[in-house]
Amino acid sequence: MFSNNKYPANAQPPEGGCSFALCVLPFAFFLLFSACVEIEEYPNNPHGNFEALWKIMDEHYCFFEYKEVDWDKVHSDYSKRIDNNMNNESLFKLLDEMLQELKDGHVNLYTPFDVGRYWKWHEDFPPNFSADLIDIYLNKDYSISGGIRYKILDDNVGYMYYGDFSNGLGETNLDYIIDKMAICSGLIIDVRNNGGGLLSNAEKLAARFFNEKTLVGYLQHKTGKGHNDFSKPFPHYIELSTRLRYQKPVIVLTNRGCFSATNDFINSMRYAPNVRILGDRTGGGSGLPFNSEMPNGWMVRFSACPSFDADMQQIEFGIDPDISVELKNQDLQKGKDTLIETARALLVSKH
């Protein structure tokens, strides 16, 4: 009757890039301008492209030590399989297989004919989400503001679903939503299957649930070519919003489809007062993704800057909820979402 949907994470090709170079995008915590770190050139043949890709990752990928990946062994294993006579499709499959050794959803190989991706961070787990159920709860009388669908449920619990942090979100959008939800006994923020997007939108939303500037994590960047050549940790704060802020209990719903910017949003919300996280462990994805171009014009995206929580703990492999709840099949068949119903009961009992 109802489908327990899995949606793939966003896998759009990166914009920009500079030939044979690592393109470092502007990021406020350590750069005031964009830069490109030049790497040595390689011939445009299968061996040359293999060596170029391996070298890019060797010098710039940020999770080798944390994930205990022996990248030299990977080189030894895969270089034996490279043949200058292999066609593009065969080369792509081999290089993508090599990149999957990193088990990183932020690692993609972009070609004109396919996109290499690692999606096991959510495909190997129960989705705990159904888009059909969300449509039932929202019905037809919901509002839309800045990519957020929201309404007040019949027990006076506010509900909002934000499925993509790439969707525009302005301060005025949030003012309208929070003002409408002010009469509710509590608020459910559903970000299940949100594969990420703009960190600025994630932080803009999170800031509406803090009453003071709050440390939520740390960031580092590479300072050299070694696997452990990192800068000192830079503290990352959620700044106090001067706009309307929500003061009642909040429950954030999560599943394995919460990745990248959504993982960062969940991490921030853990430090907000009156907020609890309910559902399943998130999908992770805490490395800031940069991109580089290979000799043949293919593009590789990868995690280049690690981020941590406020205790300097890794969140690359996800964040556990405060309250673990799975979507029960018997509820699914009845048109009920176990996570939403559990959150509603908790919020009503607190009122």
Residue locations for each model-derived region?
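Intrinsic disorder/low-structure terminal segments
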Residues: 1, 17-19, 26-32, 62, ...
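C-terminal "post-core" interaction segments
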Residues: 37-40, 44-51, 89, 156-157, ...
